[in-house]
Amino acid sequence: MRRSLAPSQRGGQRLSSRNDFTPPLLKKNKRACQQDLEQERLRQSALRDATNTSDLPLPIRFTANTEYEMAIAKVLARKFKVPIDNYVPDYGGNRTLGVRRRIVRRPLHDPLACNALVLYHAPNYTDHERMSMEPSSVLVHVVVDPLLSNILRPHQREGVRFMYECVEGKRGNFNGCIMADEMGLGKTLQCVALVWTLLKQSAECKPTINKCIIVSPSSLVKNWEKEFTKWLHGRMHCLAMEGGSKENTVRALEQFSMNASTRLGTPVLLISYETFRIYAEILCKYEVGMVICDEGHRLKNSDNLTYQALMGLKTKRRVLLSGTPIQNDLTEYFSLVNFVNPEMLGTAADFKRNFENCILRGQNADSTDKERDRALEKTQELIKLVDQCIIRRTNQILTKYLPVKFEMVICAKLTPIQLQLYTNFLKSDQVRRSLADCKEKASLTALADITTLKKLCSHPNLICEKIAAGEKGFENSQNILPINYNPKGEINPELSGKFKLLDFMLAAIRAHGNDKVVLISNYTQTLDLFELLARKRKYGFVRLDGTMSIKKRSKVVDRFNDPESDCFLFMLSSKAGGCGLNLIGANRLFMFDPDWNPANDEQAMARVWRDGQKKPCYIYRLVASGSIEEKILQRQTHKKSLSSTIIDNNESAEKHFTRDDLKDLFSFDPDILSDTHDKLKCKRCVQNVQMMPPPDDTDCTSHLSQWYHCSNNRGLPDNILAQAWTDSKCVSFVFHHRSQSQKIEATPATETSVEAKLEPERRKRPAMPLSDDSADEDFQGF
């Protein structure tokens, strides 16, 4: 109360009944609706008084039940509509507050949406059937996340569906498969879609698997993590095991293995083959939903420890990725199939007796008609079995998305110095004795001799120390080299036919355009010679071999692919970067020396013709005419023919080499144009001159016998090679073909390639390389 209104201050007077003061607390607590009622009561009282004293009309009062108010209420009661043109609500768009409805099972994604990829089609239940069924027994569609299905190409959608049907046992009594697509077709993206779908969905409205292990080469672990982040936009985290202490690794793996929750924070483990082998005891204790083995041809030997460790995993879903499931023989192929689906082909002995022996006899060029018929019968039987669990697409699919690719096998003549050193080595008594000791199986001595000859075919610099020391095979060769010969810190390209040709071609490429070049070799010593040549000609270059760290490799690749970079050459060790590396900054590639395993060369040569390439590509494979390099090329052709028969189901693959041809590694004819062409017994050529072109349906994936054959520089698709043939005078023969069905015409030296207009725009794929290893481990004897 105000002090001025207190009785002591008012002199005992009462407060006026008309004062307007209201205690603040009472005013605060008084509800607004009560105030309105009070004011309304006073107003009505005033109106009644006025009516009694005057003839004023009463005001019109509107009530809520008038027609106008009802119309307004009806408008306001309309259902909310999203103010977006052509908006289609999802399944939850009709949900409202109120009484809880009965739970209805629905697929995670709309199976009727545009580009929807439905992996499992649920039964079409009627309303009556749904009412009579238990909610837990209703099956739903399994639909790939639109985030992924909208970017998958047609062949990738087919691959995801195939793998899903295999791991779910819908294609037979098995749960494993082999994804055998060739390089560049997106095997990684297909696996990301499969894993993401299985982790989130099933026909029973719950995850199919709770965790997955992906095993890959150590250099690809980080790449897998990048792929998941790239395609899923960070929606899922992976546990990538790379480096770290043993204690931290054990703790992380135990936590991953023991966690059986269906909603893990890191449901995917990325681990290398080596790390998995070390910690297999931890990972094999508990069940795993699925295992994926990248570069699965590493499991070609069923007796090694890594294979045995992976077989110990408690999982029935196994996916193996390999663009080259047959690299050397059918025994390796059996190991891969047996890993994903044990007992599908029986035991190793059963497979050898029932399939391998018969098929190999029929593959021989001197086999009888009966043996060939028997081989064909067994081949069809094997294909029928494995077709249930293997999917194979060639990179011919890429012709729809990439520019044309020209591939050339160039036979370069040895220089007089190389020729004399090669002949002296083969005539050496010590070499003859060592070769006589190894009739059927390779010995360490024979392998060393083969490596020596391979290096000699590349450049005498690679064996100069052996020549100077007069080692086996070079006892009388010290005087063959020039007097002023200095192999250290200097290179003379004129001493090697292949280096001489390379020198001319690099100069022509540099002078006639802005093309970049990749140089690949199996030996780091050869990369040293590339580096000396680049410094001598003042070419900008970068180099990648097994000594470079993984982090630095990525920076080097990005620098080379930058169009503004001054790097002209990329020098690459085939074993260090032959897998997964993306070098689309270059469109010309030289494979300087062949590998025993055709898969290694194929992987290395696929570095430039990949997603993102916008220029026509030229692949040059250099071999020394008539030398051991041509013998290696013939073995590659034989192995690829076997793969074509079994994997690609190519029944028309001709048999061109006998076993004796393949064993005859050390024969040498210095005057031959091409030992490979002679052994092909080509029916389209007369005296090494092509009289008929290859069939129209062939390309660079076909057998060498179905390529273009050139004994001169007329008709070549590349003006750079045509000019170098004339200038270097060291080319004896060329096989060439293209990737697309386009007419090949000779290109004048003043013109650019006709294919330069092809500029498709596709995804850029990050990649990582493998470790360096230049051993001839794939040589399997004579």
Swiss-Prot record:
Alphabetized InterPro entries for the sequence: Helicase_ATP-bd, Helicase_C-like, P-loop_NTPase, Rad54_N, SNF2-like_sf, SNF2/RAD54-like_C, SNF2_N, SNF2_RAD54_helicase_repair
Modified residues (Phosphothreonine): T22
Required for chromatin remodeling, strand pairing activities and coupling of ATPase activity, as annotated region: 2-9
Keywords of the record: ATP-binding, Cell cycle, Cell division, DNA damage, DNA repair, DNA-binding, Helicase, Hydrolase, Meiosis, Mitosis, Nucleotide-binding, Nucleus, Phosphoprotein
Coiled-coil residues: none
CDD domains: DEXHc_RAD54A, SF2_C_SNF
GO biological process, one term: double-strand break repair via homologous recombination
Main location: nucleus
Gene Ontology terms, MF aspect: ATP binding; ATP hydrolysis activity; ATP-dependent chromatin remodeler activity; DNA binding; DNA translocase activity; helicase activity
Pfam family, any one: Rad54_N
EC class (word): hydrolase
Record EC number: 3.6.4.-
Family, similarity comment: Belongs to the SNF2/RAD54 helicase family.
Function in brief: Involved in mitotic DNA repair and meiotic recombination. Functions in the recombinational DNA repair pathway. Essential for interhomolog gene conversion (GC), but may have a less important role in intersister GC than spn-A/Rad51. In the presence of DNA, spn-A/Rad51 enhances the ATPase activity of okr/Rad54.
Record's subunit section: Interacts (via N-terminus) with spn-A/Rad51.
Name of the protein in question: DNA repair and recombination protein RAD54-like
Gene name, Swiss-Prot/TrEMBL: okr
